[in-house]
Amino acid sequence: MEKSPDLVLIQATSIRSSNLPLFLIHGDDGDISKYFLLDPLDRNVYGIRNRCCDSAKAWPGGIPEMAKAYLDLIRAVKPRGEILLGGWSLGGLISLEIALVIARNQFSPLNVEGIIMIHTIFPSHQLRIEQVSKRPDSNADSHNGVGPCMIHNQRMIATWRPSPWPIRHIYTGLSDFESESPIVPQEPERISEIRYRQPPPPTILLRARHPASLVARCNNAGYCADTHCHRPMLGWESYREDFIVSIIDIEGNCFSIFDNNYVEGYISTDTLLDLHPICNRIAVVQFDAPVRLYLGLLVITLIDNKNNVMLFHYFTVRVNSDICIISIDLNLPSTGPISQTVNSKLAALASTTQGLNVPVLDLIFPTAAYTQLMSDTGAREMDQRKRQKDFTHTTIHDKNS
């Protein structure tokens, strides 16, 4: 795919950096110039602009069409691996739709590790489409068609609702399962199936401190304004209670938050660390013999030293010859059939490895953690006290643990 003028590199970092790239989607005005005001984030940061604003035209397919087009732009520079998404206002909604498109494809080589929403309001709290349609295109003579662009975008928002997170089908139950596919077994009669609704990426909400001035300014400008933006989560509690993992109040209102006297420090490396999936942990395990293990939440495959490959979230990660990594999705209830399946699998692994003691490490970003772990020659010489922790204790923990 040829380089598109709609995808702009805003910040560049060292080619050796393992920090996840951040893709920031335009706001209601279709512009990305405001993102150039952000502090250095020690990663590649890209901005995606709305090309339709140049001609003041609308996207016929609305937000879903925009998400698919923008995903193609992302794949052009990051065809596989983990990414972060984000954006101001409408950009947060498009980021969520992109994440949904990726999540629906179980074999997608891309994975969204987190989302940053900059004063993005849940769309059910916007004015209804009838009210938006009555707004005159009074700003049609605005610079570069920004006025009509915002009207088109508000109409799209008024008709869009985020879909529930996709249901995954996970097969478990075989320790000697030799299929090359992480999903479909060669002997399905020997496999049990678990269906679960996977959690969305951890999301940070940057919330403007002055919603009242936001509403007044929107109304005066003739745009659709949200009359419920005083809600603590800007309405996202109506989507999923576990969707927003952190709320950060920022100065100004939705229009002024990118003013020079406000913008410093809004998105920083510390903010990005908050996107750490707090319910995920990894365990580093040494095996003397080839082992294949299937857990009921994620397809987790430990492969023998000869192949030296592990499938994780359907991604392939190279590891050292005698170290494999287990990742357990802990963002689920601590009781019930699914967690019971996981506990039984953990117990089976402990039995298989004859009570192997395993240390547990916290993850910030998986890619960076893997790189650091694999390059750290001291990883095999971990503290002996940590090694005393029995593997059977590395079970599902509460989200707040």
Curated annotation (Swiss-Prot):
Stored Gene3D superfamilies: alpha/beta hydrolase (3.40.50.1820)
Alphabetized GO MF terms: hydrolase activity
Pathway note: Mycotoxin biosynthesis
GO biological process, one term: biosynthetic process
Matching SUPFAM superfamilies: alpha/beta-Hydrolases (SSF53474)
Pfam assignment, any one: Thioesterase
Region Disordered, annotated ranges: 379-401
Catalytic activity, EC: 3.1.-.-
Keywords noted in UniProt: Hydrolase
Parts forming coiled coils: none
Protein family per UniProt: Belongs to the AMT4 thioesterase family.
Name of this chain's protein: Probable thioesterase FGSG_00047
Organism per entry: Gibberella zeae (strain ATCC MYA-4620 / CBS 123657 / FGSC 9075 / NRRL 31084 / PH-1)
Lineage of source species: Eukaryota, Fungi, Dikarya, Ascomycota, Pezizomycotina
